UniProtKB/Swiss-Prot annotation:
GO terms for biological process: gluconeogenesis; glyceraldehyde-3-phosphate biosynthetic process; glycerol catabolic process; glycolytic process. Involved in the gluconeogenesis. Catalyzes stereospecifically the conversion of dihydroxyacetone phosphate (DHAP) to D-glyceraldehyde-3-phosphate (G3P). It comes from Listeria monocytogenes serovar 1/2a (strain ATCC BAA-679 / EGD-e). It comes from the Bacteria. It holds the Pfam family TIM. Gene3D superfamilies: Aldolase class I (3.20.20.70). The gene is tpiA2. This is Probable triosephosphate isomerase 2. Its EC number is 5.3.1.1. Substrate binds at residues 9-11, 174, 212. InterPro entries: Aldolase_TIM (IPR013785), TIM_sf (IPR035990), Triosephosphate_isomerase (IPR000652), Triosephosphate_isomerase_AS (IPR020861).
């Protein structure tokens, strides 16, 4: 049984230690009754230490929004996995569409980051998703298969279970509406089929949906058989909104 999972990516919206403290201090008490759902936050990078201090001793996971493909070295401006370990972080976001589109991250670099995170026992939340809406399920599966095969080409299939896939269709990120639920379920089902075809155990891999998640669509999305949780964006900037999403997932999947 895959445990439901809800995460939030703060991107560069809540950027000060004071803002992050305020959000966490308001949110943590609201999550006390939802032990059947795992939660995590990717805070603005400059607030990671504040986040680590406030989440110490809780089950609320956290980590950076990116990491270097190497442990250490001449990588100016990157964030080392050694720093992640030092902070006792347990997640790392890898391959977000904005990293690829704005900073031109290559698939080969993303694949190295995934492997490094797995080697260091940190859970990589790997973002995948097509750039434009597919016309049918075959087109959708083919688009996702190209991504998964490239990203996981050198990773042992026995490690797939330690990865979280965040399905985020690029055309739905930051938009007014999410993808429709039939489309979302088709994508999640396709991802499981791809994992199985590569030799992995698709029943062990958690796949969550991100892209214009809100209170209004959360329940319908997580009712889908192959959806294990949600990856929240700006809607979760209000602590009660994030807690409401966790509550919905708990009631629907817990």
């Amino acid at each position: 049984m895959r445990k439901p999972l809800v995460g939030i990516n703060m991107k560069n919206y809540i950027n000060t230690r004071a803002q992050t403290s305020e959000w966490l201090e308001a949110t943590i008490p609201l999550l006390g009754n939802f032990s059947d759902v795992d939660t995590f936050i990717f805070p603005s990078m400059g607030t990671l230490e504040t986040t680590a201090n406030l989440l110490a001793g809780t089950s609320f996971g956290f980590g950076p929004q990116n990491m270097a493909p190497e442990k250490s070295g001449p990588l100016t401006g990157e964030f080392s996995v050694e720093s992640i370990i030092d902070l006792s972080a347990n997640y790392v976001e890898i391959g977000h569409a904005e990293r690829k589109n704005l900073f031109h991250e290559k698939t080969s670099e993303i694949a190295k980051k995934i492997q490094l995170a797995l080697d260091e026992k940190i859970t990589p939340v790997v973002c995948v998703g097509e750039g434009i809406r597919a016309n049918d399920t075959n087109e959708l599966k083919n688009a996702l298969k190209k991504q998964i095969e490239a990203l996981f080409d050198t990773i042992q299939v026995t490690q797939f279970k330690n990865v979280v896939l965040a399905y985020e269709p690029e055309w739905a990120i930051g938009k007014a509406n999410s993808a429709d639920t039939d489309y979302i379920e088709s994508a999640h089902q396709a991802l499981r089929e791809i994992i199985r075809e590569l030799g992995g155990d698709e029943t062990l891999v958690r796949i969550i949906y991100g892209g214009s998640v809100s209170k209004e669509n959360a329940a319908e999305i997580v009712r889908q058989k192959n959806v294990d949780g949600l990856f929240v964006g700006r809607f979760g900037h209000k602590p009660q909104n994030f807690a409401d999403i966790v509550s919905i997932v708990s009631k629907t999947k817990g």
